[in-house]
Amino acid sequence: MSRSPLNPSQLRSVGSQDALAPLPPPAPQNPSTHSWDPLCGSLPWGLSCLLALQHVLVMASLLCVSHLLLLCSLSPGGLSYSPSQLLASSFFSCGMSTILQTWMGSRLPLVQAPSLEFLIPALVLTSQKLPRAIQTPGNSSLMLHLCRGPSCHGLGHWNTSLQEVSGAVVVSGLLQGMMGLLGSPGHVFPHCGPLVLAPSLVVAGLSAHREVAQFCFTHWGLALLVILLMVVCSQHLGSCQFHVCPWRRASTSSTHTPLPVFRLLSVLIPVACVWIVSAFVGFSVIPQELSAPTKAPWIWLPHPGEWNWPLLTPRALAAGISMALAASTSSLGCYALCGRLLHLPPPPPHACSRGLSLEGLGSVLAGLLGSPMGTASSFPNVGKVGLIQAGSQQVAHLVGLLCVGLGLSPRLAQLLTTIPLPVVGGVLGVTQAVVLSAGFSSFYLADIDSGRNIFIVGFSIFMALLLPRWFREAPVLFSTGWSPLDVLLHSLLTQPIFLAGLSGFLLENTIPGTQLERGLGQGLPSPFTAQEARMPQKPREKAAQVYRLPFPIQNLCPCIPQPLHCLCPLPEDPGDEEGGSSEPEEMADLLPGSGEPCPESSREGFRSQK
């Protein structure tokens, strides 16, 4: 075991085999004398499985939270099938979407999972039938409150409500896929700067704090223990390295390279420890809404129409439009944030278009399987990438396979519901904090001292948090006389991320400002143009390959019809031709809490996975 508190090595995805290699400490005067050489070779399968299991735990936390809040909002009653099968169908659709996303979508190691962008419209849709079921006076959060009084009766069966929500998920998937096929990111990105993306990330980190506190409230001791262990493993013990597996150096000699095990497993170790402790003290109890009256089957094949087909109504169409707009805004933010945390160039429009298209396909699959939640890029999983400072396509593929396996076995999926709620709250709290800090750190890319920018940032964040709270605490909701329009307006005006992105976009493009002031220097149409402009040409060319399609599919691009050419990279990417004259040491490490330069040798390791 070795410890290097002054220069902790940063881990990133390198090589076509997705190996994780520690970066050398900075040596500005002689870059060739780094204490560590770039390492090649495939990532050990044991470590890959552990890293994938961490992502599954974070995804399971999101799924349990989403299903629990939604089922608690329904009228008293019950499902005609096991809730574990509903959870398994969500795992299956998320796993398939993750595999497609990392293989031929954005190509980033992004895990697909449901988010608040799907939950909020679903709650609005069900609350229209249950006006007194989930509204608690004086409370602005999505309360875990089920109306059990005599006034809550005969308001519809659970199956019918979930059918309508599944219909909204199908509509959102179709709209999101259409936006990707039409190349919407390519039209929007040139008008988006750091002042559009950064407020959205800040609001994304803050928007779930009430729900996190609600789950932590069930047992603050266990929640604080999880948070404390995650902080200690990822930060205080992050520089402790162990010789755990053999790697091959750039030279011909073979050696054992130490890895920061505590930081890499800073989610798995705390969750496993507290989960075991809570089981010993008898606190690991499955919530009533997720408990199955009968044992779930070990093997089960999800297929469309098993529990009735999705119900397409005007109200479901309105909720689906809100889901599509909010989920697309959130996903584009995840693409840019994940690329930045992995020190890649900003994702090009063709990668974002493919990502949105395949996310839409995943949501359509989820809705047809009866899941009440669609699939989108997950902010908590991106926060986990920033927490452990590593990302790998190989790990993301394993996550997808594990989720498909859980979807085929409801009994195994039900096992994850035994994770104590305070553990779920603690994990989501730490990962959301990383997203929040990444949003704050993005402001430096623009002139934050400008009065124009100060107003845009403050107004966007404050209004995105104020409007949802006002609508949730309003004693009487607005009524237009047409229920679908009420659902659409209420869903959009209670989506914090959508409001932050929309207000930032409108203010950024209507208030006069210079390109440099807006953070759009050198004419590069991306949210992180200042970062890309400082990246040397050769490392940028190598890193940009991660967004390109796999070789067999790349050969099919000439056969794609002209309207769909936005899904394929250009023969000569303009971003690859613009070089920079700065040295590798000028590219600062953008991960939260670190300030080490990123050497050129590490950036040359990025390659697309064939």
Swiss-Prot record:
Residues 1-49, 107-164, 209-211, 288-316, 377-394, 447-452, 508-610 are cytoplasmic. Belongs to the nucleobase:cation symporter-2 (NCS2) (TC 2.A.40) family. Keywords: Membrane, Transmembrane, Transmembrane helix. GO terms for molecular function: transmembrane transporter activity. It comes from Homo sapiens (Human). Residues 1-32, 571-610 are annotated as: Disordered. GO terms for biological process: hypoxanthine transport. PANTHER family: XANTHINE-URACIL / VITAMIN C PERMEASE FAMILY MEMBER. It comes from the Eukaryota. Pfam families: Xan_ur_permease. It is found in: Membrane. Acts as a sodium-dependent hypoxanthine transporter. May show xanthine-hypoxanthine exchange activity. This is Solute carrier family 23 member 3. It is a multi-pass membrane protein. Residues 1-16 have a biased composition (Polar residues). Residues 573-588 have a biased composition (Acidic residues). Residues 601-610 have a biased composition (Basic and acidic residues).
